[in-house]
């Protein structure tokens, strides 16, 4: 089996990365190296068309089959829900702990849904699979947890501004291909937008995204909400441990390559003291206060940034803020690797290696 030996000085863990050639999987591989994860071997897996491809560091993509998945301590998945449902439990049965970045297991009761800074103690109850939250939920959780601990969260209204990269590399590529044809005629953009939009095709996003805002992403349900919006509600409840949390979500796609933003109106059980709220946010790990947080400024950065923090004009128990984060890093790959690190630190993986 082709892999990278000795990744992490003194490491003894064998790590599989499933979906290694995708946008998130590529970042996972980079982070495993840059963060010196204690691995003796890292093996990339991907679709059949990528098998045999040589990645950075000389890693060679392996096929997913019962002959190749044995003997791993940790398996990091970012290959979509269908692939996760098919293969995650098989990795577990072969001895690995799986950290899954898809939606496959997030709503399963006995699968922990974890943000590394928010609820790492949930890892202790895992039965072989740990779920990574949706990238939009992830970005919002850090400030919400800090404020929940201070004032007890009761409800929230959240509007997301989600980057094209939330749809994967194909989402980025589609936006990039639309920019030049539309930018070539600014007058048409201003005076006949429908004709301008018709000059390009779209298949990934619900409408032409360049120079536009698209208030629909995900699958629309009978109640008028998309599955992306339901994820934001359901995952927030599970991660924060507030089953009755009232969430009113709206998810919007914006013409940004990487970096999600969320405007949040959070209402608490207690009256909010602004200075105490700012102190709680400033003290929270991996969260920075920024007067003007923008997705572009935080693309490629590990931190989540929160700003425009202000008391509501109508309700003293309500706080408004805007939060941004890189959807490929903290929103996906970084949290996945952080969860693997936390599993190791808590002694929850490596039994096979220890017994060897």
Predicted regions span which residues?
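Conserved PLP cofactor-binding pocket of PLP-dependent enzymes
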Residues: 285-303
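Short amphipathic alpha-helices in soluble, non-transmembrane regions
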Residues: 274-284
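Conserved glycine-rich beta-strand-loop-beta hairpin in the small C-terminal domain of fold type I
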Residues: 257-262
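Short, solvent-exposed loop/turn elements at beta->coil junctions and helix N-caps
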Residues: 250-255, 293-296
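Oxyanion-binding "anion nests"
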Residues: 201-251
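Short hydrophobic/aromatic beta-strand micro-patches
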Residues: 265-267
